[in-house]
Curated annotation (Swiss-Prot):
Cell compartments where the protein resides: Cytoplasm
Keywords, sorted A to Z: Cytoplasm, DNA-binding, Transcription, Transcription regulation
Stored Gene3D superfamilies: 1.10.10.200, 3.30.70.980
Name of protein: Probable transcriptional regulatory protein YPO2055/y2255/YP_1898
Family: Belongs to the TACO1 family.
InterPro entries per the UniProt record, alphabetical: Integrase-like_N, TACO1_YebC-like_2nd/3rd_dom, TACO1_YebC_N, Transcrip_reg_TACO1-like, Transcrip_reg_TACO1-like_dom3, YebC-like
Gene Ontology CC annotations of this record: cytosol
Source superkingdom: Bacteria
NCBIfam families assigned: PRK00110.1, PRK12378.1, YebC/PmpR family DNA-binding transcriptional regulator
Single biological process term from Gene Ontology: regulation of DNA-templated transcription
Pfam assignment, any one: TACO1_YebC_N
MF annotations from Gene Ontology: DNA binding
Main subcellular location of this protein, as a coarse class: cytoplasm
């Protein structure tokens, strides 16, 4: 949907996927455990862990649950053989797709990812085939209703790189991904309440989808997210309001 924030576009379906909350929590816990195992349990010194904590809180995970996950990671629990794997590919309509996975079995994971691409008319690419189109950034999102100048002044003072205001009034604040936690803390201190905060891969170009290719891309994303090994799916597909109305 052109002119709308990514919360209403590339991830717009997530709001309607409450049935998947259990699976989402499982994936977030896996990331918390892995981040704590690799970088320690102090989010101030571990940007990956801080990003995972922000994501957990954005999804209404309790502090008790996330603290237990961190403790498991620091203690070297059963997820110690998990590794991060990034797959790249081409989706319907020539879209560029990045698939971030946490897995203890590369063969299983690549088989599931390749199957999703093949079933929806896309194809799995090689390393570097589309990653050059994406930049890793921190994103802090605000719902419509805030004054643009207020958010902009606070964001720049907090050390943010950029802000984008969408047609619906939603605002995204972009930061270096390592600075996401510090910038969010500074914005929180001003009284601004974020709708969400996460590390994301931001595309430099967009691929416009039509009424035929848009449903195929959404199916690809759903198939990928149904895999227990897939943590996040990023893409550069753009769905216009007119096309979205037909879905």
């Amino acid at each position: 949907m052109a002119g709308h924030s990514k919360w209403a576009n590339t991830k717009h379906r997530k709001a309607a996927q409450d049935a998947k909350r259990g699976k989402i929590f499982t994936k977030i816990i896996r990331e918390l455990v892995t981040a704590a195992r690799l970088g320690g349990g102090d989010p101030g010194a571990n940007p990956r862990l801080r990003a995972a904590i922000d994501k957990a809180l954005s999804n209404n995970m309790t502090r008790d649950t996330l603290n237990r996950a961190i403790a498991r990671g620091v203690g070297g629990d059963e997820d110690n053989n998990m590794e991060t794997i990034i797959y790249e590919g081409y989706g319907p309509g020539g879209t560029a797709v990045m698939v971030e996975c946490l897995s203890d079995n590369r063969n299983r994971t690549v088989s599931e990812v390749r199957h999703a691409f093949t079933k929806t008319g896309g194809n799995l690419g090689t390393d570097g085939s589309v990653s050059y189109l994406f930049t890793k950034k921190g994103v802090i999102s605000y719902a419509p209703g805030l004054e643009e100048d207020t958010v902009m002044d606070a964001a720049l003072e907090a050390g943010a790189d950029d802000i984008v205001v969408y047609d619906d009034g939603a605002i995204d604040v972009f930061t270096a991904w390592e600075s996401l936690g510090a910038v969010k803390d500074a914005l929180d201190a001003t009284g601004l309440v974020a709708e969400g905060a996460e590390v994301s891969l931001i595309p430099s170009t967009k691929a416009e989808l039509d009424a035929e290719t848009a449903p195929k891309l959404l199916r690809l994303i759903d198939m990928l997210e149904d895999s227990d090994d897939v943590q996040e799916v990023y893409h550069n597909g753009e769905i216009s309001d007119e096309v979205a109305a037909t879905l």
